Amino acid sequence: MGAPVMLAGINRSLFATADDELRPVMNGIYFDITTEDITFVASDGHKLVRNKTFVAHGDEKAAFILPKKPATLLKNLLPKEQGDVQIDFDDRNATFTLENYSMICRLIEGRYPNYNSVIPQDNPHKATIDPHDADQCAPPCICILIASKQFNKTPPQ
């Protein structure tokens, strides 16, 4: 997969990972790889991020959980790369090969929860947003959410 595609998936998912010693599988980004797409999933039990990209895909169905620390390291390395990222993994380790770097890390062992079961499938409400319009809208919406969280006892003025 291309470095920019992987960077986008990590950036969109990393904030939703947990810091939970009792549920270690939630402390990373779940890579759900199929022959059609790659889905980046992260959740801390309160928020869920599912980012599906059809630009990249695997040779066969596979999955692994990348811990938060290696994901953060990749987040810092990937902006320096423009080529493809090759991912090789087994049950315990993953190797990320970039043009100028190679990283081997230990994966989180365990089974990630079925994230599709908590996403409504027959939801009658759908929204289609032009990506250019979303870029103009998203930052103010995020600021409002952050402000309301910080001032949850008194509404923001």
Question: What is each residue range found by the language model?
Answer:
Residues M1-K52, A56-I108, N123-Q157:
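DNA polymerase processivity clamps
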Residues R111:
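Glycine-rich, pocket-lining loop/helix-strand segments that form or immediately flank
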Residues V118-D122:
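Short hinge/gating elements
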